[in-house]
């Protein structure tokens, strides 16, 4: 980000309260390079309800229950230009969007729907959330430390969706359309329907996102080789892309009797992507790539009145792609056609039991078994003759079949100790087996909730977790990006990372939230860049660090000015430490303190007609990732929201990243490593229209994990 933009950005932030509602779309970038076909692959990188305290003239937006905070999310977003579940979650205190994903208090967070954990990857789950209308949300439960009975470890957000109530027939629906311009045009159409008849209810959802993309990347590198030579490389990369994504969901519930239910949910996704890239400068390259992704996910759940829950889930994912590459770099020449595919079959079965006992005791236990088979290949061909090419230093043909099995057995209890103190504790034992790893681990979880006075809540949590690597990251393969100078290397020896965290949260007057935490991650894994000392290539590869540590403080403070301004400010300060003693030939031990500021303001311009202006913003100071340095970044967004037809129709005009300061240009200046990537940044303007029809007679409904797919 150019420094001349920092001052006006900060002035705007301080003069008009802001927030971090960053718009997520196909142009979001993260510091990884997992796919050879993205627009810019280098940047992929108990049970006791506590009393509420009413603030004069306001309803509480949050109430505390043992181990979790329950937010009135529809109220939080009622005046915001939010039209889908993903953007709605970004309005929760402490939730930010970083690198195209959601974080809670600076840490990764798992999102589930209706209390059901899915086998969808993170990317597939986010796509599903973006297709779910915000009007379908009933509430959000935030857990900084999820008990084992949720079959999730670490931070968790549970989104409960509205359903029709039992009784007479009812139906309702929503139509949505959006047009945006971010250098090139983009479109979205969405339709949803909710139906109920006696004991049966169903929901249907379809969305279509499509458009064109444009990106520019300027690279500057000083590449040092072991022979003492230094090579100056400067390139200009221009990419043009187009894509279509179709998402569909069908969910059904049959209520056999009270608390006796059979449910089935199907989620599907089909997408196509086409990219053309031209590179000039020290390297001259032309790259064309295409991909098609199919995902099918089905889940069956059965719940009984005596606390028994059972279920099964199947996920099928298939992602074939191809790439045609012609590249010249000094005396090196690359000419080949690559065809690759990842096909995943994953099954999950679970059985869980909960008991409500006397004297405030609760008992829960269960087992979860997950198995997957990854069939992947990557082959190289001569682009002229179509003949297969044999493996060499530059070409690595690969075909693999990898099976993974996980068995998790857990038990836990809850106890109310009077009116002010409650406790929830559990222990999970897990066996993880692959062709490389065969290990047992245990994961303790403890939550304490103390209410010294009405409206004042103190929560303390101790948790442990494991983060599994992506399937494609552990393949023994080499892929090319950036015209050939950049290579992506798989790492078959990549191991899961293990995380341990202690966190304290204090809620004042049921709306002011303060948190402090410490987190230690052993074998932390992230994709990093390394300029090879043996040849003129830069290598992107997932590696296990010795550890990563974080300590942080967070404050979330909402405030209002009469009836015309509703605001919230969230501040975070984080100490960040990463260490790796065997990082190639340049071990590192790096520390950094950085801050994050989010602010959100809604100005009521008029009540008749209903017209509101939303101004949001985000600032993130300098940070690190491995040997990367990440510059200061931030954005300012504005949206004008007009509600008509008694709230059934909403028109939203918006402009995101007004100052074009949201995209960072990461750089490396560490020992022999010297490289900078300047990425293009464009403001986005758009308009959306939402129309609701039918009538809601509300009841209560969850999503899948695809984070590790290619």
Feature names for model-found ranges:
Residues 184-212, 228-275, 296, 304-305, ...:
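Transmembrane beta-barrel wall of Gram-negative outer-membrane proteins
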Residues 22-77, 97-99, 106-108, 141, ...:
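Short, acidic, small-residue-rich periplasmic hinge/interaction motif at the N-terminus
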Residues 85-88, 125-127, 152-176, 187-189:
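N-terminal periplasmic accessory domains that precede
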Residues 591-710:
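Conserved C-terminal beta-signal and adjacent last beta-strands/turns
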Residues 245-271, 287-444, 449-455, 510-516, ...:
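Face-selective signature of the C-terminal outer-membrane beta-barrel domain
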Residues 177-183, 197, 208-212, 268-272, ...:
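Transmembrane beta-strands of outer-membrane beta-barrel pores
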Residues 118-145:
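Short acidic/polar hinge/loop motifs at secondary-structure boundaries
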Residues 466-516, 520, 540-552, 560, ...:
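Outer-membrane beta-barrel signature, preferentially recognizing the C-terminal barrel domain
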């Amino acid at each position: 980000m150019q420094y001349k933009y920092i001052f006006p950005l900060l002035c705007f932030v301080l003069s008009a309260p802001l927030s971090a509602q960053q718009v997520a779309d196909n142009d979001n970038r993260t510091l990884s390079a997992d796919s050879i076909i993205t627009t810019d692959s280098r940047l992929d990188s108990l049970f006791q309800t506590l009393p509420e305290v009413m603030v004069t003239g306001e309803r509480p937006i949050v109430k505390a229950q043992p181990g979790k905070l329950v937010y009135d999310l529809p109220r939080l977003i009622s005046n915001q230009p939010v039209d889908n579940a993903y953007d709605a979650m970004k309005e929760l205190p402490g939730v930010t969007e970083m690198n195209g994903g959601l974080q809670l208090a600076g840490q990764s967070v798992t999102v589930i729907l209706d209390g059901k954990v899915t086998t969808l990857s993170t990317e597939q789950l986010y796509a599903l959330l973006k297709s779910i209308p915000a009007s379908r949300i009933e509430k959000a439960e935030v857990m900084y430390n999820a008990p084992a009975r949720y079959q999730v470890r670490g931070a968790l957000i549970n989104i409960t969706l509205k359903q029709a109530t039992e009784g007479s027939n009812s139906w309702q629906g929503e139509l949505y359309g959006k047009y945006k311009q971010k250098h090139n045009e983009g479109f979205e159409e969405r339709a949803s329907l909710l139906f109920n008849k006696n004991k049966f209810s169903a929901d249907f959802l379809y969305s279509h996102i499509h458009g064109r993309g444009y990106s520019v990347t300027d690279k500057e590198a000083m590449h040092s080789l072991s022979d003492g030579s230094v090579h100056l490389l400067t390139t200009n990369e221009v990419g043009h892309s187009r894509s279509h994504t179709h998402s569909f969901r069908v969910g059904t519930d049959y209520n056999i009797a009270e608390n006796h239910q059979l449910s089935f949910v199907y989620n599907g996704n089909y997408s196509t992507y086409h990219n053309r890239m031209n590179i000039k400068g020290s390297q001259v390259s032309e790259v064309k790539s295409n991909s098609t992704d199919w995902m099918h996910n089905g889940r069956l759940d059965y719940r009984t009145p005596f606390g028994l829950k059972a279920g099964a889930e199947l996920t099928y994912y298939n992602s074939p792609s191809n790439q045609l590459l012609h590249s010249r770099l000094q005396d090196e020449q690359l000419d080949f056609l690559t065809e690759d595919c990842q096909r995943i079959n994953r099954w999950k079965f679970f059985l869980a039991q909960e008991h409500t006992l006397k004297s405030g005791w609760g008992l829960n236990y269960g087992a979860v078994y997950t198995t997957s088979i990854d069939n992947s290949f990557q082959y190289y061909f001569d682009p002229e003759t179509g003949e297969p090419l044999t493996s060499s230093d530059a070409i690595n043909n690969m075909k693999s079949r990898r099976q993974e099995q996980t068995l998790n057995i857990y038990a836990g209890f809850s106890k109310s100790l009077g009116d002010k103190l409650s406790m929830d504790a559990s222990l999970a034992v897990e066996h993880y087996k692959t062709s490389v790893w065969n290990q047992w681990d245990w994961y303790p979880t403890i939550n304490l909730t103390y209410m010294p006075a009405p409206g004042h809540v103190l929560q303390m949590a101790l948790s442990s977790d494991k983060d599994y690597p992506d399937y494609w990251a552990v393949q023994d393969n080499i892929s090319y990006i950036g015209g050939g100078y950049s290579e992506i290397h798989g790492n078959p020896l990549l191991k899961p990372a293990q995380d341990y965290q202690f966190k304290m949260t204090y809620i004042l007057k049921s709306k002011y939230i303060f948190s402090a935490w410490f987190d230690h991650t052993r074998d932390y894994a992230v994709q990093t860049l390394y300029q090879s000392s043996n040849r003129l290539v830069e290598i992107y590869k997932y590696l296990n660090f010795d550890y990563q540590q974080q300590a942080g403080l967070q404050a979330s403070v909402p405030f209002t000015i009469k009836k015309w301004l509703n605001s919230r400010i969230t501040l975070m300060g984080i100490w960040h430490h990463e260490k790796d003693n065997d990082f190639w030939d340049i071990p590192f031990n790096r520390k950094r303190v950085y801050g994050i500021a989010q602010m959100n303001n809604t100005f009521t311009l008029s009540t008749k007609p209903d017209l509101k202006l939303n101004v949001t913003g985000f600032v993130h100071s300098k940070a690190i990732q491995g040997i990367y340095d990440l510059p200061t970044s931030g954005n300012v967004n504005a949206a004008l929201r007009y509600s008509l037809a008694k709230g059934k129709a909403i028109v939203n005009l918006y402009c995101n990243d007004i100052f074009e300061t949201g995209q960072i240009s990461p750089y490396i200046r560490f020992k022999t490593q010297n490289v900078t990537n300047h990425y293009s940044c464009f403001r986005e303007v758009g308009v959306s229209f939402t129309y609701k029809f039918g009538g809601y007679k509300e009841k209560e409904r969850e999503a899948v994990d695809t984070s590790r797919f290619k």
